Amino acid sequence: MKEIEIRELKRVKLNAPVMIEGLPGVGNVGKLVVEHMIEELHAEKIIEIYSWHFPPQVFVKDDGTVRLCRNEVYAWSSPKLDLLILTGDQQSITNEGHYILTEKYLDIAEKFGVSRIFTLGGYGIGHLVEEQRVIGAANSPELVEEMRRFGVEFMEEEPGGLSLIHI
């Protein structure tokens, strides 16, 4: 296997899609959200990504055979909005692998002319919270203001993981 193998399952044309990433992480929040989106929208799997940066594990399929860990990209299109949805089994097991895989994810985004990327993930604070909220980070003041209009909160000096590398 190559360091990263990208298998294109189907070619699709999208118009300046928005990319949404939800990989396993704290509480599997991002993964659960995008899996729900994929199911509700009937998004179509178009890419499989394999890498030796994923844990050396296999998953047992319904028929009893196994498959390697992988991440996947789904596409969905409507007259008003096109989406690319990135999800999968694992994140990288190394710090270096996070950056290498992120570069490939961004290559995919560039190939499709992605207009914006949102990454989703949980935020561990060490205890249960009474009131849930959405905490964000962005790469421009304009995007911060736009997200604030939707109730997203921003916290100074907070660390972030892979879900923030993509932004």
Which role does the model predict for each range below?
Residues 65-163:
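Glycine-rich phosphate- or other oxyanion-binding loops that anchor nucleotides, phosphorylated ligands
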Residues 165-167:
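Conserved small/polar residues in nucleotide/adenosyl-binding loops
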Residues 1-89:
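N-terminal short beta-loop-beta anion/metal-coordinating cradle
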